[in-house]
Swiss-Prot record:
Localisation per UniProt entry: Cytoplasm
The keyword Cell membrane belongs to this UniProt entry's keyword annotation: no
Superkingdom per UniProt: Bacteria
Principal localisation: cytoplasm
Keyword entries, A-Z: Autocatalytic cleavage, Cytoplasm, Decarboxylase, Lyase, Pantothenate biosynthesis, Pyruvate, Schiff base, Zymogen
Residues that bind substrate: 57, 73-75
A GO molecular-function annotation: aspartate 1-decarboxylase activity
Gene3D superfamilies per the UniProt record, alphabetical: 2.40.40.20
GO CC annotations on file: cytosol
Residue numbers annotated as active site: 25 (schiff-base intermediate with substrate), 58 (proton donor)
Name recorded for this polypeptide: Aspartate 1-decarboxylase
Subunit structure: Heterooctamer of four alpha and four beta subunits.
Amino acid sequence: MRVHLLKSKIHNAVVTSGDLQYEGSITIDSELLDLANMIPNEKVLCVNNNNGERFETYIIEGKAGSREIQLNGAAARCALPGDEIIIMTFAEIEAREAKSFKPMILIVDKHNNPKRRHLVGEEDNPL
């Protein structure tokens, strides 16, 4: 049996812009992707901390160091620039491995600069 678990999360990301006319997706700074163990085209679940809205989309890699979190297409209707969101990816894992699996958590500041990074259940690593 396989179970669906949190794989990684960018916590407290701030939406920097939106492009309603784009085909869809969320553009994320490539440095943040690397730190959070996320990859381009990966499906994400986003939660808007300002209004409670939840939406799914996929990742587009943004420019390294830009600290960009841009919502594209219909997702741009779900959060406005300045809104704080949580970006999560999930993985299917064999049930016998699930108890030892540890998701990666990246916490960013209000400018999307990485603050801390850790595996769930392990000590924070300030960045």
